[in-house]
Each structure stands twice: as C-alpha cells, then as structure tokens.
Amino acid sequence: MQIIHEDPKEGKVKVKAETLDDLWHLYHIIDEGDVVYAKTLRKQSQRSDSLRAEKVEVIPVFLGVRAEKINFHKFANQVRVTGPIVYASREDVPLGKYHTIAIEEGTVVTIQKPRWKEHHIERLREAVSASKRARVMIVVIDDGEADMALVREYGVEILTSIRHNLGGKRYNTDREAEEKRFFHDVAKTMEEIMNREKVEKAIVAGPGFVKEDFYKFLRENYPELVKKVVIEDTSVTGRTGIYEVIKRGTVDRVYHENRVAKEVQLIEKVLENIAKNNGLVAYGLREVEEAANYGAVETLLVLDELLKGEMREKIEELMDAVRYSRGEVVIVSSEHEGGEKLKALGGLAALLRFRVK
C-alpha cells in the first residue's frame, strides 16, 4: 500500500492499493459511515426527447460514497463499497442515489473518517510496511506429490497441487526418470509462482527424504532457485503439512515479521495455556474484560470479524483499555486456521501477565 496524501484536519487519507493484501487491509480499515472517494464508472440514463427511447451510457466520474456495505471479494480481487453518493464531479450525477465503488489492485482511493482510531492507523502502517516485505511460499513434498501455498497478509492461500505416478521400487530406472520429471515440474512451477508473486523465499518441507533429494536436484539444476529455498521437516503432507510448517515457527524464522505466522503461534499459545489450566489465559468477552480491568492482559487477540459486527464499539473500548495498560493488541484474520480456532473461543482471547483468579 502506498500513502499518497494525508489531511488530518479533514480526516482524509489518500492511498493506492497495490496488492491483494492491500485490499484485505482496506476492507478492515473502511467502516460504515466513512466516505470513500474514487474514480469509477456509472451508468447514466440519457434521453434527447420524449419520443425517443431512453439510452443508457457508462460515464467515468469521480464520486464520494458514504459506506453502508463493505464486502471483500477475494476471488474477484475487489473490495466493494456501496452507499449513497455524497459527492460527484459531474453535475448530471444526482446525489443521494446509490452506487458501488469497486476497489482493485492499482485503484487510488481516499478514505474520510470522522475519527481515525488506533487500530485503523496501525493497520494502515502495517499495510505500508507489508508492501515492502516479501511473502513466503510453502511447498510440502513427498513421493510424487507436492502441495504449494502462499502465506499472504490475510491468510494462507493454497495455490496448486502436483501429482506424478512414480511407480514401484525406489531405485527402479523408470521411477528415477519419472521422479526427475516430477522434480522439474515442481521447480518450474515454483519459479513461475515466485516470479509472478515476487516471493523471495520458499520453504520446502515434507515427512521423508524426498525434500532432501529435491534440494539436491535444485542445487544441480536450478542454482538460482535453490538460493531462495529453506528445508523443513513435517510429520504429514498436504494442507495439514502446510499448517504444520507455520505452527513450527519456520515461516517466522524465514521472515520474522510475517503476520499469519505470528497469529497462528499466538493462538497455539492460548490453546496450550487452556490445556495446562495455568490461569494465564482468558477467553470470551466476560473473562477478557475482567482481566483487562486488572491490567493483566499482555496480549489481546481479537478476531477481525468482531470489528465489523454489532459489538464493535465495546471491542474498541476493550482494545483501548489494553493499550492503556501497555498490552499488545493483535487483530487476527478469520481467513486462516488460527482465526477459525479463535472464533470457536468466541473471537476474543488474552494471554495474561499474571493470574486474576
């Protein structure tokens, strides 16, 4: 994300969305009641006289829309903001009519808020910082099968699976030839994805020796690619293996600032403390509020969905209270496994400095 201009007096920030991750951040920055300004296309009815049929044309126009609905369409790569028009650059566009602004990669948009809250500012800074960071690719590989995923700012995106039938015995000549074809297929797919997505690092993981064989193959055949590869063990393959890599902290070690890795590990710490029954965790609104009142919250985990729901004001007050007592607030994406686990706990959890019971 690129910040183009800030106008604190008017409560306006003009930004350019550069990636899919930026769209995810904007979805959480824009609230109901905000005014969103952008260049857009609008259908306009034209009639030259009463005898002629009404003609509809699409016109380019700069609009300001007061947000009533904000939707993130991951597969269309869009954030859609719908609401009444409050500003139009053309006089023939009536104010008060409803319009949807589609924010895509490359869209320049101005957001105006009555008040920019701390979590909005934090997310904006994070989006700008994230745009300078490389994302991480995970490849879980075993006999004739490889699953690839991209760790994005909003969660884990499963990209593709590659399957080759390698046949029987491990040292059979035909098998070795097919394995080489499989390795070439995986390597070329990795290169294509890493170039397209501008990924600087790939974690190659798996339960057996195949990952080491693949690494050796890369060293001999893809010397530039192998420089970007880190090897890791997993106990399983497939999607479960991908999440195991994240839980082990490998993504964090490879790129220590990665948001998803941090969120998943914090949720695992919460679950670990619950299992230990050590009193150093609270979850659910009542328990977390009580811990915050004592100043006991070291890290507050908030599911992003709560900041779009009816409890938003109450949650924001809780976040402010935790920050006041020098606790850390982490907004957890609902788009990954850790977010699903937090949702099962009511969407709120806290790691505590000391026991309150």
UniProtKB/Swiss-Prot annotation:
Give its localization: Cytoplasm
Give the main EC class: hydrolase
Cofactor(s), names only, from the UniProt record: a divalent metal cation
Superkingdom of this protein's organism: Archaea
Q: Any idea of its EC number?
A: 3.1.-.-
Q: Which GO terms describe its molecular function?
A: endonuclease activity; metal ion binding
* Gene Ontology, cellular component aspect: cytoplasm
Which SUPFAM superfamilies does the annotation name?
Dom34/Pelota N-terminal domain-like, L30e-like, Translational machinery components
Q: Which Gene3D superfamilies match?
A: 3.30.1330.30, eRF1 domain 2, Pelota, domain A
Q: Which Pfam families match?
A: eRF1_1, eRF1_2, eRF1_3
Q: State the UniProt keywords alphabetically.
A: Cytoplasm, Endonuclease, Hydrolase, Metal-binding, Nuclease
**InterPro entries reported for this sequence:** eFR1_2_sf, eRF1_1_Pelota, eRF1_2, eRF1_3, Pelota/DOM34_N, Pelota_arc, Ribosomal_eL30-like_sf, Transl-rel_pelota
Q: Name one GO biological process term.
A: nonfunctional rRNA decay
| Cell membrane listed as a keyword | no
* Domain notes per entry: The N-terminal domain has the RNA-binding Sm fold. It harbors the endoribonuclease activity.
Q: Which NCBIfam families match?
A: pelota (TIGR00111)
- Would you identify the family this protein belongs to, as annotated? Belongs to the eukaryotic release factor 1 family. Pelota subfamily.
Q: Assembly and partners?
A: Monomer.
Give a short account of what the protein does: May function in recognizing stalled ribosomes, interact with stem-loop structures in stalled mRNA molecules, and effect endonucleolytic cleavage of the mRNA. May play a role in the release non-functional ribosomes and degradation of damaged mRNAs. Has endoribonuclease activity.
Q: What is this protein called?
A: Protein pelota homolog
Q: Which gene encodes it?
A: pelA
